[in-house]
Curated annotation (Swiss-Prot):
Residues 258-277, 295-305 have a biased composition (Basic residues). Residues 1-19 form the signal peptide. GO terms for cellular component: extracellular region. Its main location: secreted. This is External core antigen. Homodimerizes. It comes from Duck hepatitis B virus (isolate white Shanghai duck S31).
Length: 305
């Protein structure tokens, strides 16, 4: 963290401030590479790519504060760090955790120094209008080494004899604003990647889609509460945990020959199996009664007798 000592002399403060701003500009501004849409080089699914782009449209108060976000991200990344995972979401989320931690405190320090410079700015000095300050979209097109020069030219075009201390204040406010917008995009991307590790990319994609639908629906036609990712993933977890596991082992198929099904037919009132061997035909004519034995000629005594 760097400190800018303010001296009572305007010239001393101005010279020291300009020297500090030009030398440390490359170390104080967030790398603009984090603001570029990079999902094309990550080989994302088309639905996940659209959901990631839609993260930028979500309201600012939807995301946690910087401190809470970094803490939650570290908790989610800790198991992957221990196993030295090289998953896509792990690598990118780790990059944004480091970037946000490094530049968030620096940006806050730039605001504090800019506010402290007000004491040495002449009270009659008018602030530089927003149109003369470099915006985030313009900073993406300007080389980092030329950023200070471009901003200085705009201040001179606004007022050629603008006080030097006020110029330093304008520079710091412009750079802090660029950093804040870059950190906001980095914060949204960090939220996306570490939630993909917690819930799965498909579930986060589905959640973003439902949330945007809920936000775009008029209030009187939508539910009172916004959808949550816990509610979306809960049915899947219940279905997986509710399956009953059988204690026995299932008999494998195809290892034993299938038993041939026995077909039976009825021939003149007698049941005969086709699979059995057929007996030799009887000399009796088919359908004639069987001859009785000699003992069967005697009539059995009547039960009345």
């Amino acid at each position: 963290m760097w400190n800018l000592r303010i001296t009572p002399l305007s010239f001393g403060a101005a010279c020291q401030g300009i020297f500090t701003s030009t030398l440390l500009l490359s170390a104080l501004t967030v790398p603009l590479v984090c603001t570029i849409v990079y999902d094309s080089c990550l080989y994302m699914d088309i639905n996940a790519s659209r959901a990631l782009a839609n993260v930028y449209d979500l309201p600012d108060d939807f995301f946690p504060k910087i401190d809470d976000l970094v803490r939650d991200a570290k908790d989610a990344l800790e198991p992957y760090w221990k196993s030295d995972s090289i998953k896509k979401h792990v690598l990118i989320a780790t990059h944004f955790v480091d970037l946000i931690e490094d530049f968030w405190q620096t940006t806050q320090g730039m605001h504090e120094i800019a506010e402290s410079l007000r004491a040495v700015i002449p009270p009659t000095t008018a602030p530089v209008p927003t149109g003369y300050l470099i915006q985030h979209e313009e900073a993406e097109e300007i080389p980092l080494g030329d950023l200070f020069k471009h901003q200085e030219e705009r201040i001179v075009s606004f007022q050629p004899d603008y006080p030097i201390t006020a110029r330093i204040h304008a520079h710091l406010k412009a750079y802090a604003k660029i950093n804040e917008e870059s950190l906001d995009r980095a914060r949204r991307l960090l939220w996306w990647h570490y939630n993909c590790l917690l819930w799965g990319e498909a579930n986060v994609t589905n959640y973003i889609s439902r949330l945007r639908t809920w936000l775009s629906t008029p209030e009187k036609y939508r539910g009172r509460d916004a959808p949550t990712i816990e509610a979306i993933t809960r049915p899947i977890q219940v279905a997986q945990g509710g399956r009953k596991t059988s204690s026995g082992t299932r008999k494998p198929r195809g290892l034993e020959p299938r038993r041939r099904k026995v077909k039976t037919t009825f021939v003149y009132g007698r049941r005969r199996s086709k699979s059995r061997e057929r007996r030799a035909p009887s000399p009796q004519r088919a359908g004639s009664p069987l001859p009785r034995s000699s003992s069967s000629h005697h009539r059995s005594p009547s039960p009345r007798k």
